[in-house]
UniProtKB/Swiss-Prot annotation:
Regions that span the bilayer: none
Native organism: Mycoplasma pneumoniae (strain ATCC 29342 / M129 / Subtype 1) (Mycoplasmoides pneumoniae)
Sequence ranges assigned to domain HD in this UniProt record: 55-181
Pfam families (alphabetical): HD
UniProt-recorded name of the protein: Uncharacterized protein MG461 homolog
Molecular-function GO term, any one: dGTPase activity
Lineage: Bacteria, Bacillati, Mycoplasmatota, Mycoplasmoidales, Mycoplasmoidaceae
One GO-annotated biological process of the protein: dGTP catabolic process
Length: 425
């Protein structure tokens, strides 16, 4: 097989070279191909019409960034098998995403606060990695599926000697975040993500400390790292946590709350959408996603989901469900209102809820979950490491005044934490 490459508007091209061309067999699996029909931004495209790019292109982008990182001289001492394991983990890291991407994870939650409960896409990804045909493809190329799964799912145990591998895929500055910030900014038409990723890659170093490899960034790269963190913060403010998108996602949370109640009363029919029923019915009955659902899950994508909602809207005789689906499909009737304090929010919630018949389907409290500006605070091993001109090693939080003051600057006086989401009367 010759080299395989894709043209890409963000990175120029995605290349499967002589060392990695076997990984194209993973791209051709059904689990990976379905990502062509899973939008990267879920339902945000309702408000950012250009944002219809997919998990497929993003996953290829993450692979390509990792390939370029690992081909730099800094990573020359690293064993080729380790490099290929990182590349595979980057390529496959999102194959467990459901229709509507992250939004799906809250549809079956008890409360609409983006807390993962019954469906966690990282766990589903690891199920795919440890199932056929992906498992056999990896083993045939001397790649350990369990290590790949551990790199993707942070809840899985990882040897300290392999922390550097996970950092390239999941950290405050990793290939995943590099690609989605660049890609999402480009396709939504925003200008936040002016990230000099090429220089960041050149300034990365892989150094042995006490016998264990660690990732370092040269200190002259500090302004680029700070810009990267600010960019991510602004993207969450303006794109990922857009109030209209939250309202739309919670509109569908209400839809599934109503479906759940109808299922409990044996009054709901999936109208022939068998694969969707095989995945959603257990979740509606509070059963955690498991391996036996994979054959049905791999058939689901955004188009199946949308077809289901349209069919349900046209056929349902339930007035509440009809009203909720009309809002989602035709003209969004849900709004979000933010409050300065929890007490103000709760008081207004009680006042507004009294105006609704069947209020639990039309108004809810919502606690906006802010992403941390710098998550390295949570664990010393997750800190971004800086290598000074004097060849000394330090942590980003010790050298960056911006990171030191990030909570004060970005979160202590946040005005958009407490909210109500409600159907407009």
């Amino acid at each position: 097989m010759q080299q395989i490459f894709f043209k890409d508007p963000i990175l120029g091209e995605v290349l499967f070279d002589q060392q990695t061309k076997w990984m194209y067999e993973l791209v051709e699996t059904e689990a990976f191909r379905r990502l062509r029909n899973i939008k990267q931004l879920g339902i945000n495209f309702h408000f950012y019409p250009g944002g219809v790019h997919t998990r497929y292109s993003h996953s290829l982008g993450v692979y390509e960034l990792l390939r370029r990182i690992l081909n730099t001289p800094a990573f020359a001492p690293i064993d080729e098998n380790k490099k290929q394991t990182v590349l595979v983990a980057g390529l496959l890291h999102d194959i467990g995403h459901a229709p509507h991407s992250h939004a799906f994870e809250i549809y079956f939650a008890k409360a609409p606060n983006f807390k993962k409960e019954l469906f966690i896409h990282e766990e589903v990804t690891t199920l795919f990695v440890n199932s056929e045909p992906i498992k056999s493809i990896l083993k045939a190329n001397q790649i350990d599926p369990k290590l790949v799964a551990a790199l993707i799912d942070e809840n899985k145990e990882l040897k300290p000697s392999n922390y550097w591998m996970r950092q390239l895929i999941s950290s405050d500055l990793d290939a995943d975040r590099m690609d989605y910030l660049l890609r999402d900014s480009y396709f939504t038409g925003t200008s936040h993500s002016l990230i000099d990723y090429q220089t960041i890659i050149k300034e990365m170093d892989c150094v042995k400390v006490k016998g264990i490899y660690e990732i370092f960034f040269k200190d002259k790269c500090l302004p680029l790292i700070e810009n990267f963190l600010i960019t991510r913060h602004h993207m969450y403010q303006s794109i990922y946590s857009d109030g209209r998108s939250i309202s739309t996602e919670l509109n569908l949370w209400f839809v599934f709350q109503r479906i759940k109640d109808l299922v409990d009363k044996n009054q709901f029919d999936f109208n022939g959408y068998k694969t969707l029923e095989q995945v959603c019915l257990p979740l509606l009955k509070n059963e955690h996603f498991d391996k036996k659902m994979l054959p049905a899950f791999v058939k689901l994508d955004d188009y199946v989901f949308q077809s289901f909602f349209v069919n349900l809207y046209q056929t349902t005789k339930d007035k509440i469900l009809k009203k909720l689906l009309d809002s989602y499909l035709n003209s969004l009737k849900f709004e979000i209102k933010f409050y300065e304090t929890k007490e103000q929010r709760d008081l207004d919630f009680e006042k507004q809820a009294s105006k609704y018949k069947d209020a639990k389907y039309f108004i809810t409290k919502f606690n906006n979950q802010f992403k941390g500006f710098y998550e390295g605070w949570s664990s010393h091993k997750n800190e971004l490491k800086i290598k000074t001109m004097q060849n000394k090693h330090t942590n980003l939080s010790e050298i960056s005044m911006l990171v030191k003051r990030s909570n004060e600057l970005f979160f202590e006086n946040a005005l958009y934490k407490w909210a109500n989401v409600f159907y407009r009367l």
